[in-house]
């Protein structure tokens, strides 16, 4: 959750949203939360291999329109607000062919069924039978194409048992790729362990995502950056990278701009959940093993009271 305008209301909405997502009660949240995305700006990230349009949704979610400029074909990640997706595709004059769903929680998959009615013939990918309108179930290292772009599916169970991250690259290109991480990896944070263990999150972050090229751009599912960095500062108060990123993120939020994307290389400098091998993080947790450190700091984060500064 982000701090700032209407923060008391947003705390309540975020808590409600998490509950609705776990219980499949997305419609209960719909009327309450659409308004906040109007205060957050869209952003188009021009990568040499693709264009990515960041589409704010609900209180703090992101949807991502991935555009292959060679073919003008596009995919959408987690289209919880279908009408916004349709409008973005029209703006860019692209053909929407593919839905990439990271996990079944309503604030990510809740728009699938409406979108496929608005755009018949869409291919809907995901790793969990609980995902609405699913047409193609994928597993770890499954691959698919969006125009000339290659999409590799990475199984990262923990937040949910069927969570998939999507690594998008262009064959033969030396330019940075992108990974769409849903609720597994956030800027300076990770998702709650609703259906998994610390060992699974360790494998997801360090052994799956952490082994991608360091310059890979990370597009996560929520704008949680300021709060995540305040917890990171609590864990490592002497880490200059955290202090610098927090100051930058506060400035971005103040003007309604996204703090996404980061890169994997950056995450290893300030994300405590990516830094569980570091002595400073282990000492804070009172542990000497990366997995038990992961478990300890996740439990602490779940109870962390975010300072107002």
From Swiss-Prot:
Residues recorded as bearing N6-acetyllysine in the entry: 90, 117, 230
Gene3D superfamilies, per database record: Ribonuclease Z/Hydroxyacylglutathione hydrolase-like
A Gene Ontology biological process term: glutathione biosynthetic process
Cofactor dependence: Zn(2+)
Residues where substrate binds: 192-194, 222-224, 298-301
Residues modified as N6-succinyllysine: 230
Residues binding Zn(2+) 2, per UniProt: 107-108, 183, 222
Cofactor note: Binds 2 Zn(2+) ions per subunit.
Positions bound to Zn(2+) 1: 103, 105, 159, 183
Keyword Transit peptide: yes
GO molecular function: hydroxyacylglutathione hydrolase activity; metal ion binding
Alphabetic keyword roster: Acetylation, Cytoplasm, Hydrolase, Metal-binding, Mitochondrion, Transit peptide, Zinc
Keyword Coiled coil: no
Transit peptide range per the UniProt entry: 1-24
Annotated pathway: Secondary metabolite metabolism; methylglyoxal degradation; (R)-lactate from methylglyoxal: step 2/2
GO cellular component terms, A-Z: mitochondrial matrix; mitochondrion
InterPro entries the record matches: Clx_II_MBL (IPR035680), HAGH_C (IPR032282), Hydroxyacylglutathione_Hdrlase (IPR017782), Metallo-B-lactamas (IPR001279), RibonucZ/Hydroxyglut_hydro (IPR036866)
Family: Belongs to the metallo-beta-lactamase superfamily. Glyoxalase II family.
Subunit relationships: Monomer.
PANTHER family to which the protein is assigned, alphabetical: BETA LACTAMASE DOMAIN, HYDROXYACYLGLUTATHIONE HYDROLASE, MITOCHONDRIAL
Name under which the protein is recorded: Hydroxyacylglutathione hydrolase, mitochondrial
Lineage: Eukaryota, Metazoa, Chordata, Craniata, Vertebrata
UniProt gene name: Hagh
């Amino acid at each position: 959750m982000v701090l700032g305008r209407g923060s008391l209301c947003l705390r309540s909405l975020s808590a409600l949203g998490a509950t609705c997502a776990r219980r499949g009660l997305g419609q209960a949240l719909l009327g309450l939360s659409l308004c906040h995305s109007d205060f957050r700006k869209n952003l188009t990230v021009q990568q040499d291999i693709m264009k990515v349009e960041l589409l704010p949704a609900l209180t703090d979610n992101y949807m991502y329109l991935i555009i292959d400029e060679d073919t003008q074909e596009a995919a959408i990640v987690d289209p919880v607000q279908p009408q916004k997706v349709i409008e973005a595709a029209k703006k860019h004059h692209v053909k929407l062919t593919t839905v990439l769903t990271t996990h079944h929680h309503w604030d990510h998959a809740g728009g699938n069924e409406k979108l496929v009615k608005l755009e018949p013939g869409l291919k809907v990918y995901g790793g969990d039978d609980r995902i609405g309108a699913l047409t193609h179930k994928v597993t770890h290292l499954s691959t698919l194409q969006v125009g000339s772009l290659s999409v590799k599916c990475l199984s990262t169970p923990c937040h949910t048992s069927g969570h998939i991250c999507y690594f998008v690259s262009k064959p033969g290109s030396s330019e940075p790729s992108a990974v769409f991480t849903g609720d597994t990896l956030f800027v300076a944070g990770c998702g709650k362990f609703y259906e998994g263990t610390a060992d699974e999150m360790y494998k997801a972050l360090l052994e799956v995502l952490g082994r991608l090229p360091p310059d890979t751009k990370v597009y996560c599912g929520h704008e949680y950056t300021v709060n995540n960095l305040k917890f990171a500062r609590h864990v490592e108060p002497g880490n200059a990278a955290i202090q610098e990123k927090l100051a930058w993120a506060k400035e971005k939020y103040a003007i309604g701009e996204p703090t996404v994307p980061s890169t994997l290389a950056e995450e290893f400098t300030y994300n405590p959940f990516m830094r569980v091998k570091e002595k400073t993080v282990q000492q804070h947790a009172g542990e000497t093993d990366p997995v038990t450190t992961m478990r300890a700091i996740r439990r602490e984060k779940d109870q962390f009271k975010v300072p107002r500064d």
